[in-house]
Curated annotation (Swiss-Prot):
The lineage of its organism: Eukaryota, Rhodophyta, Bangiophyceae, Bangiales, Bangiaceae. NCBIfam families: L28 (TIGR00009). It is found in: Plastid, Chloroplast. Its main location: plastid. It holds the Pfam family Ribosomal_L28. GO terms for molecular function: structural constituent of ribosome. This is Large ribosomal subunit protein bL28c. Belongs to the bacterial ribosomal protein bL28 family. It comes from Pyropia yezoensis (Susabi-nori). GO terms for cellular component: chloroplast; ribonucleoprotein complex; ribosome. It comes from the Eukaryota. GO terms for biological process: translation. Keywords: Chloroplast, Plastid, Ribonucleoprotein, Ribosomal protein.
Length: 63
């Protein structure tokens, strides 16, 4: 299973962890993914999805 949001397509972001002395080490900022059941009106059933918390937030705002 890939570490990608099935709704928005979000993936991990490459960045740097910067110390006090400004030494930079590479860091992977992962997406906060959650397993969630979402109602699909087209299929008339619950669908299990792996979606980001940002997508969950927008889904609850639209309902």
């Amino acid at each position: 299973m890939s570490k990608k949001c099935q709704l928005t397509g979000k993936v991990a972001n490459n960045g740097y962890a910067v110390s006090h002395s400004h030494k930079r080490t590479k860091k992977l900022q992962k997406v906060n993914l959650q397993h969630k059941k979402v109602w699909s009106s087209g299929q008339n059933k619950w669908v299990k999805m792996l979606i980001s918390t940002k997508a969950i937030k927008t889904l609850t705002q639209t309902l």
